[in-house]
Regions:
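Acidic (Asp/Glu-rich) sequence patches and key acidic residues
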Residues: 1-123, 127, 131, 135, ...
Length: 156
Protein backbone atom coordinates (compact mmCIF):
# COMPACT_ATOMS: atom_id res chain seq x y z
CA UNK A 1 0.00 0.00 0.00
CA UNK A 2 2.73 2.46 0.94
CA UNK A 3 5.73 3.16 -1.22
CA UNK A 4 8.85 4.85 0.03
CA UNK A 5 8.30 8.60 0.49
CA UNK A 6 4.59 8.66 -0.36
CA UNK A 7 3.52 9.47 3.18
CA UNK A 8 4.63 11.48 6.20
CA UNK A 9 3.46 12.19 9.76
CA UNK A 10 2.50 15.72 10.80
CA UNK A 11 1.15 17.59 13.78
CA UNK A 12 -2.14 19.49 13.53
CA UNK A 13 -0.18 22.66 12.72
CA UNK A 14 1.01 21.00 9.46
CA UNK A 15 4.57 20.62 10.73
CA UNK A 16 6.16 17.35 9.67
CA UNK A 17 7.51 15.50 12.67
CA UNK A 18 9.58 12.55 13.78
CA UNK A 19 8.92 9.91 16.41
CA UNK A 20 11.53 11.50 18.67
CA UNK A 21 9.82 14.91 18.49
CA UNK A 22 6.40 13.40 19.17
CA UNK A 23 7.80 11.39 22.08
CA UNK A 24 9.37 14.53 23.60
CA UNK A 25 6.11 16.47 23.29
CA UNK A 26 4.19 13.57 24.84
CA UNK A 27 6.56 13.52 27.81
CA UNK A 28 6.35 17.30 28.28
CA UNK A 29 2.55 17.34 28.14
CA UNK A 30 2.35 14.29 30.40
CA UNK A 31 4.36 16.10 33.09
CA UNK A 32 2.17 19.19 32.70
CA UNK A 33 -0.97 17.05 33.06
CA UNK A 34 0.30 15.86 36.44
CA UNK A 35 0.95 19.44 37.59
CA UNK A 36 -2.32 21.00 36.42
CA UNK A 37 -4.94 18.36 37.13
CA UNK A 38 -7.88 20.34 35.78
CA UNK A 39 -6.54 21.05 32.32
CA UNK A 40 -6.43 18.45 29.61
CA UNK A 41 -3.59 18.45 27.16
CA UNK A 42 -3.38 16.72 23.85
CA UNK A 43 -1.34 15.57 20.95
CA UNK A 44 -2.65 14.76 17.49
CA UNK A 45 -0.70 13.12 14.73
CA UNK A 46 -1.92 12.77 11.15
CA UNK A 47 -0.72 10.32 8.53
CA UNK A 48 -0.59 12.23 5.26
CA UNK A 49 -0.54 10.10 2.14
CA UNK A 50 0.41 11.50 -1.22
CA UNK A 51 -1.60 10.13 -4.10
CA UNK A 52 -1.03 11.54 -7.58
CA UNK A 53 0.93 14.37 -5.94
CA UNK A 54 -2.08 15.35 -3.82
CA UNK A 55 -1.66 15.02 -0.03
CA UNK A 56 -4.58 13.87 2.08
CA UNK A 57 -5.00 12.75 5.70
CA UNK A 58 -5.82 9.04 5.82
CA UNK A 59 -5.38 8.39 9.56
CA UNK A 60 -5.19 10.40 12.77
CA UNK A 61 -4.04 9.48 16.24
CA UNK A 62 -5.36 11.73 19.00
CA UNK A 63 -4.06 11.50 22.55
CA UNK A 64 -5.71 13.46 25.35
CA UNK A 65 -4.09 13.61 28.77
CA UNK A 66 -5.51 14.58 32.11
CA UNK A 67 -3.95 13.97 35.50
CA UNK A 68 -1.49 11.43 34.05
CA UNK A 69 -4.20 9.42 32.30
CA UNK A 70 -4.47 8.95 28.54
CA UNK A 71 -7.46 8.80 26.21
CA UNK A 72 -6.54 7.36 22.79
CA UNK A 73 -8.57 7.74 19.61
CA UNK A 74 -7.82 6.67 16.05
CA UNK A 75 -9.63 8.00 12.99
CA UNK A 76 -8.98 5.75 10.03
CA UNK A 77 -10.19 6.04 6.45
CA UNK A 78 -11.46 2.62 5.42
CA UNK A 79 -13.40 2.14 2.20
CA UNK A 80 -13.92 5.87 1.69
CA UNK A 81 -15.38 6.34 5.20
CA UNK A 82 -13.74 7.36 8.43
CA UNK A 83 -13.97 4.89 11.29
CA UNK A 84 -13.21 5.93 14.87
CA UNK A 85 -11.63 3.57 17.37
CA UNK A 86 -11.00 4.25 21.05
CA UNK A 87 -8.77 2.46 23.50
CA UNK A 88 -10.95 0.70 26.10
CA UNK A 89 -9.29 -0.31 29.35
CA UNK A 90 -10.63 -3.75 30.31
CA UNK A 91 -9.12 -3.38 33.80
CA UNK A 92 -10.99 -0.19 34.71
CA UNK A 93 -13.18 -0.57 37.83
CA UNK A 94 -16.64 -0.06 36.30
CA UNK A 95 -17.55 1.29 32.87
CA UNK A 96 -19.95 3.83 34.35
CA UNK A 97 -17.36 5.24 36.74
CA UNK A 98 -16.56 8.62 35.29
CA UNK A 99 -13.21 10.28 35.37
CA UNK A 100 -12.57 13.07 35.65
CA UNK A 101 -15.54 14.48 37.48
CA UNK A 102 -14.31 18.02 38.00
CA UNK A 103 -17.15 20.55 37.70
CA UNK A 104 -14.61 23.19 36.68
CA UNK A 105 -12.71 21.05 34.18
CA UNK A 106 -11.15 23.32 31.58
CA UNK A 107 -11.73 20.93 28.65
CA UNK A 108 -15.40 20.00 28.48
CA UNK A 109 -14.64 17.32 25.87
CA UNK A 110 -13.32 15.07 28.64
CA UNK A 111 -15.98 15.82 31.25
CA UNK A 112 -17.87 12.63 32.17
CA UNK A 113 -15.82 10.36 29.90
CA UNK A 114 -16.02 6.83 31.35
CA UNK A 115 -12.98 5.71 33.29
CA UNK A 116 -12.79 2.62 31.11
CA UNK A 117 -11.64 4.80 28.22
CA UNK A 118 -8.47 5.97 30.00
CA UNK A 119 -5.17 4.21 30.53
CA UNK A 120 -2.27 5.11 32.78
CA UNK A 121 0.17 2.93 30.81
CA UNK A 122 2.55 5.50 29.33
CA UNK A 123 4.72 2.78 27.76
CA UNK A 124 1.69 1.43 25.88
CA UNK A 125 0.94 4.95 24.61
CA UNK A 126 4.57 5.34 23.49
CA UNK A 127 4.30 2.02 21.60
CA UNK A 128 1.09 3.20 19.92
CA UNK A 129 2.87 6.37 18.75
CA UNK A 130 5.88 4.38 17.54
CA UNK A 131 3.58 2.04 15.60
CA UNK A 132 1.82 5.04 14.05
CA UNK A 133 5.16 6.21 12.68
CA UNK A 134 5.46 2.80 11.01
CA UNK A 135 3.27 3.71 8.03
CA UNK A 136 0.24 4.54 10.15
CA UNK A 137 -0.03 1.23 11.99
CA UNK A 138 -3.05 1.53 14.34
CA UNK A 139 -3.69 -2.16 14.97
CA UNK A 140 -3.15 -2.02 18.76
CA UNK A 141 -6.04 0.42 19.18
CA UNK A 142 -8.31 -1.28 16.63
CA UNK A 143 -7.80 -4.74 18.09
CA UNK A 144 -8.34 -3.44 21.62
CA UNK A 145 -11.53 -1.65 20.57
CA UNK A 146 -12.97 -4.68 18.79
CA UNK A 147 -12.08 -7.00 21.68
CA UNK A 148 -13.38 -4.73 24.48
CA UNK A 149 -16.22 -2.76 22.86
CA UNK A 150 -18.75 -4.95 24.71
CA UNK A 151 -17.70 -3.24 27.95
CA UNK A 152 -19.08 0.07 26.71
CA UNK A 153 -22.01 -1.42 24.78
CA UNK A 154 -23.54 -3.12 27.80
CA UNK A 155 -24.02 0.26 29.52
CA UNK A 156 -25.75 2.05 26.64
Amino acid sequence: MFEENNYYIKFVNNKKTTFEEAEAILESKYKSSLENKKQSLGLRLDLVEIEKQIPYISKSLSISMLDGKFLLEVSDEDDEEYENYFYINPNAPIALTYYPNYPDLIDNNLHKVPLSMFTEDKEFVREVIKDFFDKGNTEKIKENYIKNKWIMDKYK
